[in-house]
A protein has these predicted regions:
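SAM-dependent transferase fold signal centered on methyltransferase-like domains
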Residues: 1-425
């Protein structure tokens, strides 16, 4: 049968195993002495209780699959053969069956997918959803991959494959359900935090948790962070629980809706000021001496800027050029400029080449930036052998803060403009 059409739930494999009959009281010591020769398989009973036969309580111990009766004794290990003769043990062959329960996901897929096709070993778990990025070679086997993951992981109810790269402005994926329920509404847990989301309508990456941990380590209680592409709030909400105030924004109206839900579910309502707007416009609102007065004092200044989207958000740094010229001098001074944490992608391999390329790119938005000011450069992941995702932390320089503000950028109009600004009680 074509493996692409196998009913994985009823998978059954017949094998022939050699077993040895011996008394119950000798079974444990025999297994201990010949442990490397015993058949071991997940959820497989390697010792069978045969009960009383001719007045003796017997056990059947299964041996490794490569020990076959027709090869006994010539091709069997000498110490095992000696033990069999010494104890007058019976060698028998028995038909056994292996099912879904006896294999890990990787083992099962290795048996079902043809040799030469890479086995998908990594996938993201988001709530009850398993998320794959299958290659062109793996796509013909997507159903068997999905069904295997579904049945081997009881917490997984839906398996999806991403169809294309993230091209739209919201960075939301186009997904295909390849197994399980067609339900992309889920609740994801990250430590003690819960996040409600629709995986198809918002950007989410569970694998960025370690990176969020790293950036959060920069923050101190009572500081204010500006999370410009906050999504459904994984960074903002965790920062708020640390005692920080967070100005958070996302242009995606669906992400904004879930942000408000998650803010309430995690009980940080008073710590977040939530926008559904263009990132640059939010910065200009907070910097503007008049508009900033609408908001509580603890949201009128920010110590850190976190930008984890879009693909290359260094270009958004132009909004910080001239910060001191377009802000309230009572709020902003040369000694309280923010630290910027920006992510992006770079095609260079060595550290020096990466830094040099990034310096060239960032100077287009912050002309006085110098690579020596970088506090930390972190490779988040290797997307492929020629492309790295990075996060770079650096302080906004006094020279750039005192420069004339940029006039090169324009705002993106939010879908729900009437709801794009926070409601202030």
């Amino acid at each position: 049968m074509d493996c692409k059409e196998i009913d994985i739930q009823n998978y059954k494999e017949e094998i022939q195993l050699c077993g040895l009959k011996l008394a119950k009281e000798k079974a444990n010591s025999f297994i201990e002495q010949h442990r490397k020769l015993i058949f071991e398989k997940m959820n497989f009973n390697k010792v069978v209780n045969l009960g009383a036969i001719d007045g003796e309580d017997l056990r059947l111990i299964f041996l490794k699959q490569d020990l076959q009766e027709q090869d006994f004794p010539e091709k069997w290990p000498k110490d095992l053969v000696d033990d069999i003769y010494k104890n007058n043990l019976s060698v028998i062959t028995q038909k056994c069956y292996l099912t879904l329960d006896n294999y890990s996901s990787i083992e099962l897929l290795s048996k079902l997918i043809p040799c030469g096709i890479p086995i998908p070993t990594g996938y993201e778990i988001v709530g009850h959803i398993a998320h794959f990025n299958l290659t062109h070679q793996q796509l013909p086997y997507k159903k068997i991959i999905g069904e295997t993951i579904l049945h081997k992981n009881k917490c997984i109810k839906t398996v999806v494959n991403k169809l294309e790269k993230l091209h739209n402005v919201y960075r939301t994926p186009e997904l295909e359900v390849i197994a399980g329920e067609n339900n992309l509404e889920t609740i994801h847990k990250e430590g003690k935090f819960v996040f409600h989301l629709n995986f198809e309508k918002v950007y989410w990456c569970s694998r960025l948790q370690v990176e969020r941990d790293r950036i959060l380590s920069y923050l101190k209680p009572n500081q204010t962070a500006l999370d410009l592409f906050c999504g459904i709030g994984p960074f903002s909400i965790r920062a708020a629980k640390m005692g920080c105030n967070v100005i958070c924004n996302d242009l995606n109206p669906h992400a904004y809706d879930y942000l408000l839900i998650n803010r309430n579910k995690n009980k940080v309502e008073d710590k977040l000021l939530c926008f559904n707007n263009d990132a640059r416009k939010v910065v200009d609102i907070i910097l503007n001496p008049i508009s900033v007065k609408k908001y509580p004092k603890n949201f009128q200044h920010f110590d850190h800027v976190y930008m984890n989207l879009p693909v290359n958000n260094i270009e958004f740094c132009d909004v910080f050029l001239g910060l001191l010229k377009k802000s309230d001098p009572e709020i902003w001074k040369t000694d309280n400029l923010p630290i910027i944490h920006a992510t992006g992608f770079v095609k260079q391999s060595s550290y020096e080449d990466c830094i040099s390329e990034i310096e060239i790119r960032i100077k287009k938005t912050l002309p006085n930036f110098v690579k020596e000011s970088i506090l930390q450069f972190q490779v988040i992941k290797n997307v492929n052998p020629h492309l790295q995702m990075f996060c770079m932390s650096f302080p906004l320089s006094i020279e750039d803060a005192l420069s004339d503000p940029s006039k090169a950028y324009q705002y993106i109009k939010p879908e729900r403009e009437e709801e794009s600004l926070p409601l202030i009680k």
